[in-house]
Amino acid sequence: MIPEPRDALAVPMRPAGFCVGPGHMVVYGNAAFVAEFGDRCVGLPAREGMLGLPADAFAVLDAVFASGRPLARWIRRDEEDWRLTAAPRVDPETDETIGVAFHLRARSDTPILRAAS
């Protein structure tokens, strides 16, 4: 099966990014992230740049960085429920957690379904 182009799926791109260190300095944000939080957010600690997220969101990033285990939870922002999913990024040489990758998805988003092969 040939993958359909993203536009054909009619799925909006959602904010995703990568942060490093215990202060969660944002080093990458996709186009949706930059549109949502601004281009100046990249290079700032997440708590300073990702305005509008509740404290629970940063507690998830803290827990993932400290434990080295992925986590997800529902958060409330802009009167809507969003799913924050975060996964540790590990240095392959030292096996230390060096950062956290994360993305946000609205509860109202339609699940992406793939045809069975």
For each predicted feature, which ranges?
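Short, surface-exposed beta-strand-loop junctions and turns on beta-sheet-rich folds
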Residues: 33-35, 90-91
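Terminal output helix/cap of sensory domains in signal transduction proteins
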Residues: 49-78
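PAS/PAC sensory module
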Residues: 81-85, 101
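PAS and related sensory helical modules
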Residues: 34-50
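Sensory coupling linkers of modular signal transduction proteins
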Residues: 89-117
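Sensory modules in modular signal-transduction proteins
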Residues: 1-34, 117
